[in-house]
Protein backbone atom coordinates (compact mmCIF):
# COMPACT_ATOMS: atom_id res chain seq x y z
CA UNK A 1 0.00 0.00 0.00
CA UNK A 2 1.24 3.54 -0.64
CA UNK A 3 2.75 5.56 2.20
CA UNK A 4 -0.16 7.94 2.64
CA UNK A 5 -3.91 7.85 2.27
CA UNK A 6 -3.76 10.96 0.08
CA UNK A 7 -1.36 9.24 -2.33
CA UNK A 8 -3.64 6.21 -2.55
CA UNK A 9 -6.73 8.32 -3.04
CA UNK A 10 -5.29 10.50 -5.79
CA UNK A 11 -3.85 7.48 -7.58
CA UNK A 12 -7.18 5.64 -7.43
CA UNK A 13 -9.22 8.66 -8.55
CA UNK A 14 -7.07 9.04 -11.65
CA UNK A 15 -7.13 5.34 -12.55
CA UNK A 16 -10.50 3.97 -11.42
CA UNK A 17 -13.26 5.58 -13.45
CA UNK A 18 -15.76 2.73 -13.65
CA UNK A 19 -16.51 -0.63 -12.13
CA UNK A 20 -17.72 -2.26 -8.97
CA UNK A 21 -16.42 -1.17 -5.57
CA UNK A 22 -16.71 -3.24 -2.38
CA UNK A 23 -16.47 -1.61 1.04
CA UNK A 24 -15.79 -3.19 4.40
CA UNK A 25 -16.69 -2.14 7.93
CA UNK A 26 -14.07 -4.18 9.79
CA UNK A 27 -14.80 -5.51 13.25
CA UNK A 28 -13.18 -8.12 15.44
CA UNK A 29 -16.33 -10.28 15.35
CA UNK A 30 -18.12 -9.17 12.18
CA UNK A 31 -17.34 -7.45 8.89
CA UNK A 32 -20.02 -5.47 7.13
CA UNK A 33 -19.85 -5.42 3.34
CA UNK A 34 -21.37 -2.92 0.92
CA UNK A 35 -21.28 -2.66 -2.85
CA UNK A 36 -21.58 0.12 -5.37
CA UNK A 37 -20.78 1.08 -8.93
CA UNK A 38 -18.13 3.76 -9.27
CA UNK A 39 -19.96 5.50 -12.12
CA UNK A 40 -23.31 5.63 -10.29
CA UNK A 41 -21.79 6.63 -6.93
CA UNK A 42 -24.52 4.84 -5.01
CA UNK A 43 -23.73 2.39 -2.21
CA UNK A 44 -25.90 -0.55 -1.12
CA UNK A 45 -25.55 -2.90 1.85
CA UNK A 46 -24.53 -6.38 0.70
CA UNK A 47 -23.97 -8.70 3.66
CA UNK A 48 -22.40 -9.22 7.06
CA UNK A 49 -19.62 -11.75 7.49
CA UNK A 50 -20.37 -13.03 11.00
CA UNK A 51 -17.14 -14.87 11.69
CA UNK A 52 -14.25 -14.09 14.03
CA UNK A 53 -11.76 -16.52 12.46
CA UNK A 54 -9.48 -15.10 9.75
CA UNK A 55 -9.52 -18.04 7.31
CA UNK A 56 -13.34 -18.28 6.91
CA UNK A 57 -13.53 -14.49 6.63
CA UNK A 58 -11.10 -14.39 3.74
CA UNK A 59 -12.75 -17.39 2.08
CA UNK A 60 -16.05 -15.49 2.06
CA UNK A 61 -14.34 -12.33 0.83
CA UNK A 62 -12.71 -14.37 -1.96
CA UNK A 63 -16.19 -15.57 -3.01
CA UNK A 64 -17.47 -11.99 -3.05
CA UNK A 65 -14.51 -10.82 -5.11
CA UNK A 66 -14.96 -13.64 -7.60
CA UNK A 67 -18.68 -12.93 -7.90
CA UNK A 68 -18.56 -9.13 -8.10
CA UNK A 69 -15.10 -8.53 -9.69
CA UNK A 70 -14.44 -5.21 -7.92
CA UNK A 71 -11.92 -2.72 -9.28
CA UNK A 72 -11.42 -1.10 -5.88
CA UNK A 73 -11.85 -2.00 -2.21
CA UNK A 74 -12.65 0.57 0.48
CA UNK A 75 -11.94 -0.22 4.13
CA UNK A 76 -13.32 1.87 6.96
CA UNK A 77 -10.59 3.28 9.18
CA UNK A 78 -11.66 3.28 12.81
CA UNK A 79 -10.26 6.18 14.85
CA UNK A 80 -11.31 8.06 17.97
CA UNK A 81 -13.57 11.10 17.54
CA UNK A 82 -10.50 13.36 17.75
CA UNK A 83 -8.76 11.38 14.99
CA UNK A 84 -6.37 9.58 17.33
CA UNK A 85 -5.55 5.97 16.50
CA UNK A 86 -6.34 3.01 18.76
CA UNK A 87 -5.96 -0.78 18.61
CA UNK A 88 -8.80 -1.27 16.12
CA UNK A 89 -7.18 1.34 13.85
CA UNK A 90 -4.14 -0.91 13.50
CA UNK A 91 -6.34 -3.96 12.90
CA UNK A 92 -8.22 -2.08 10.13
CA UNK A 93 -4.92 -1.13 8.50
CA UNK A 94 -3.68 -4.72 8.74
CA UNK A 95 -6.95 -5.98 7.23
CA UNK A 96 -6.56 -3.51 4.34
CA UNK A 97 -2.97 -4.64 3.69
CA UNK A 98 -4.10 -8.28 3.70
CA UNK A 99 -6.88 -7.56 1.21
CA UNK A 100 -4.51 -5.83 -1.18
CA UNK A 101 -1.86 -8.52 -0.76
CA UNK A 102 -4.19 -11.50 -1.22
CA UNK A 103 -6.36 -10.18 -4.01
CA UNK A 104 -4.15 -7.65 -5.80
CA UNK A 105 -6.96 -5.09 -5.88
CA UNK A 106 -6.24 -1.48 -4.87
CA UNK A 107 -7.44 -0.59 -1.37
CA UNK A 108 -8.43 2.84 -0.07
CA UNK A 109 -8.96 3.63 3.62
CA UNK A 110 -11.97 5.83 4.43
CA UNK A 111 -12.67 7.49 7.78
CA UNK A 112 -15.49 5.57 9.44
CA UNK A 113 -16.15 7.80 12.45
CA UNK A 114 -19.80 7.66 13.49
CA UNK A 115 -20.84 5.20 10.76
CA UNK A 116 -22.17 2.67 13.27
CA UNK A 117 -24.18 5.39 15.03
CA UNK A 118 -25.54 6.58 11.68
CA UNK A 119 -26.37 2.99 10.72
CA UNK A 120 -28.19 2.51 14.03
CA UNK A 121 -30.27 5.66 13.40
CA UNK A 122 -30.97 4.60 9.81
CA UNK A 123 -32.37 1.28 11.02
CA UNK A 124 -34.39 2.94 13.80
CA UNK A 125 -35.99 5.23 11.21
CA UNK A 126 -37.48 2.17 9.50
CA UNK A 127 -38.58 0.59 12.79
CA UNK A 128 -35.71 -1.83 13.36
CA UNK A 129 -34.49 -1.45 16.93
CA UNK A 130 -32.41 -3.19 19.57
CA UNK A 131 -31.14 -6.70 18.90
CA UNK A 132 -32.99 -6.88 15.59
CA UNK A 133 -30.38 -4.45 14.22
CA UNK A 134 -27.44 -6.80 14.77
CA UNK A 135 -27.65 -8.78 11.47
CA UNK A 136 -27.80 -5.56 9.42
CA UNK A 137 -25.86 -2.98 11.42
CA UNK A 138 -22.37 -3.66 10.04
CA UNK A 139 -23.46 -3.81 6.39
CA UNK A 140 -25.36 -0.54 6.78
CA UNK A 141 -22.22 0.98 8.33
CA UNK A 142 -20.23 -0.32 5.33
CA UNK A 143 -22.81 1.31 3.05
CA UNK A 144 -22.21 4.65 4.79
CA UNK A 145 -18.43 4.20 4.48
CA UNK A 146 -18.76 3.57 0.74
CA UNK A 147 -21.24 6.39 0.22
CA UNK A 148 -18.88 8.77 2.03
CA UNK A 149 -16.12 7.66 -0.33
CA UNK A 150 -18.33 8.22 -3.38
CA UNK A 151 -19.51 11.62 -2.13
CA UNK A 152 -16.05 12.89 -1.24
CA UNK A 153 -14.02 15.06 -3.53
CA UNK A 154 -11.30 12.43 -3.91
CA UNK A 155 -13.74 10.08 -5.62
CA UNK A 156 -14.73 12.69 -8.20
CA UNK A 157 -13.68 11.91 -11.74
UniProtKB/Swiss-Prot annotation:
Main location: cytoplasm
Annotated signal peptide: none
Compartment list: Cytoplasm
Record-linked InterPro entries: RNaseH-like_sf, YqgF, YqgF/RNaseH-like_dom, YqgF/RNaseH-like_dom_sf
GO CC annotation, single: cytosol
EC nos: 3.1.-.-
Enzyme category, top tier: hydrolase
Function noted in UniProt: Could be a nuclease involved in processing of the 5'-end of pre-16S rRNA.
Protein name: Putative pre-16S rRNA nuclease
Amino acid sequence: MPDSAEETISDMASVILSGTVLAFDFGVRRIGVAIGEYELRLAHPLMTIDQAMTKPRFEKIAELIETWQPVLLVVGLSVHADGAEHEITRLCQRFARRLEGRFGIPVVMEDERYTTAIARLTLEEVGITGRKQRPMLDQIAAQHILQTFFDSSHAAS
